[in-house]
Every structure is written in structure tokens, then in C-alpha cells.
């Protein structure tokens, strides 16, 4: 099953999602757009098991990292008809 991992610009660079991921899908990448100077990225989405632990670990009010599971991806992004 294919999962989509999306990182939003509300990321504060706290690394909570990276530490929560059991399959090391996420990593931190340099980014000047936040105070921490880094942002989460998802270079290995093919390893995502869809557990959504990254979402649970995110401390921001609007989750900075979201995992969309299979058909959820098109529905959540407004692509389903």
C-alpha cells in the first residue's frame, strides 16, 4: 500500500516526529524558514507503514506532518470525485 507523507510549513524543527518514526522514514533537513534552522523531510516514504506515530508526536496546533493512507490521500487532498 502506498502512503503519502506530507510536511507542512508549520514545522518548528523540534525532531519529535523523526524520533517517533519506527521505520526511519523522516529526517531533518536544513531550512532557514524556521527558528530551529531545520525542517522535517520524508525521503523514504516507501518505508512508511502508516502507523501515524509522527502525527501523534507533533506538538504544533496544526500537525506539521501528516500521513495519508492509500485512498485517504486523494480524498484528503480534494482529488476524489
Swiss-Prot record:
Record-linked PROSITE patterns: 4FE4S_FER_1, 4FE4S_FER_2
Gene3D superfamilies the record matches: 3.30.70.20
Annotated membrane topology: Peripheral membrane protein
Catalysed reactions, as listed in the record: reduced [plastocyanin] + hnu + oxidized [2Fe-2S]-[ferredoxin] = oxidized [plastocyanin] + reduced [2Fe-2S]-[ferredoxin]
Domain 4Fe-4S ferredoxin-type: 2-31, 39-68
Subunit note: The eukaryotic PSI reaction center is composed of at least 11 subunits.
Protein name (Swiss-Prot/TrEMBL): Photosystem I iron-sulfur center
UniProt organism field: Tupiella akineta (Green alga)
Amino acid at each position: 500500500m502506498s502512503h503519502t507523507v506530507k510536511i507542512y510549513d508549520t514545522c518548528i524543527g523540534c525532531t519529535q516526529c523523526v524520533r517517533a518514526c519506527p521505520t526511519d522514514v523522516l529526517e531533518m533537513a536544513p531550512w532557514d524558514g524556521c527558528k530551529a534552522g531545520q525542517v522535517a523531510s520524508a525521503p523514504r516514504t516507501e518505508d512508511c507503514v502508516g502507523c501515524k506515530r509522527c502525527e501523534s508526536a507533533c506538538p504544533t496546533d496544526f500537525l506539521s506532518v501528516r500521513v495519508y493512507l492509500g485512498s485517504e490521500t486523494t480524498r484528503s487532498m480534494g482529488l476524489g470525485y
